[in-house]
């Protein structure tokens, strides 16, 4: 495949090490994590647990803002450098997440990804900042929704397109993208690893750069050290799924 022209990243457990909704959960974290893991492994439909998790947690505006800051504190190694290097090579970077929009936008803005290239689930608050609900009509709050969003984006997507993510909802985009990369550097989900075209087992996102460039050297000299690091990490693992 030639070098890609667009990379779409998942957010939770891909660009950042945490699952934002689980981080919010506090005393109900164990139950929230259980529901999240079931959905990310494809064992239950996302729409069956999305609203349940938020109803359990009832997050306030301030708590959701804190998730955004925590995202930044828990960035996956080299996430920022990889995004900058991709953009420097003229590759469009998008973020597609089932996370909460205000928190995901905090991460995106810190990484230099414009708001219009971000998809996430909006959340609503009362005047006092208490939880008032979420956008239940969002495709990203249901299984298959990420593929639906990729299809909505299609007219504006530079191609080829590569998806990078860890969960079953990311794998569902496979029919709409040119390459699906399973990022297993935070959480390993066997079904996602088995279904992806390529797997990154490194805890760093550096391998995304040589994969996106199809192993061509970056034009920007400043990106070459990151490229070489990523290529070395790929060489140390078996990345291609057996045919």
Predicted regions and their residues:
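A polyampholytic, Gly/Pro-enriched intrinsically disordered region
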Residues: 134-146, 204-207, 218-229
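Membrane-embedded alpha-helical bundles of multi-pass transporters
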Residues: 222-228, 232-243
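Glycine/Thr-rich beta-alpha phosphate-binding loop at enzyme active sites
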Residues: 115-147
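Conserved Lys-Pro-Asp/Glu-containing loop-to-beta segment of HAD-superfamily phosphomonoesterases
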Residues: 141-171
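Anion (oxyanion) recognition and catalysis
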Residues: 87, 112, 155, 175, ...
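Short, charged, surface-exposed secondary-structure boundary motifs
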Residues: 126-132, 190-199, 209-213
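Acidic, Mg2+-coordinating phosphoryl-transfer loop and its flanking beta/alpha structural elements
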Residues: 97-98, 160-201
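Alpha-helical substrate-recognition element adjacent to the catalytic core
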Residues: 1-122, 127, 203
């Amino acid at each position: 495949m030639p070098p890609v022209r667009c990379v779409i990243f998942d957010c939770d457990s891909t660009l950042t090490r945490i699952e934002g909704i689980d981080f919010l959960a506090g005393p109900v974290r164990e139950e929230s994590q259980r529901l999240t893991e079931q959905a990310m492994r494809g064992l239950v439909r996302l729409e069956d647990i999305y609203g349940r998790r938020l109803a359990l947690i009832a997050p306030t505006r301030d708590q959701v803002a804190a998730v955004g800051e925590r995202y930044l504190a828990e960035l996956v190694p080299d996430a920022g450098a990889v995004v900058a290097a991709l953009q420097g090579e003229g590759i469009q970077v998008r973020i597609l997440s089932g996370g909460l929009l205000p928190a995901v936008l905090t991460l995106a803005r810190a990484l230099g990804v414009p708001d219009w290239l971000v998809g996430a689930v909006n959340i609503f608050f009362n005047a006092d900042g208490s939880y008032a609900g979420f956008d239940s009509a969002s495709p990203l709050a249901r299984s298959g929704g990420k593929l639906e969003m990729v299809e909505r984006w299609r007219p504006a997507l530079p191609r080829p397109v590569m998806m990078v993510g860890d969960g079953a909802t990311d794998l569902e985009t496979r029919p709409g993208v040119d390459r699906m990369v399973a990022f297993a550097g935070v959480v390993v989900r066997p079904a996602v690893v088995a279904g992806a075209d390529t797997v990154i087992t490194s805890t760093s996102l550096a391998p995304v750069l040589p994969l996106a460039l199809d192993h061509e050297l970056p034009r920007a000299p400043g990106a070459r050290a990151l490229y070489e690091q990523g290529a070395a990490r790929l060489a140390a693992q078996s990345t291609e799924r057996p045919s």
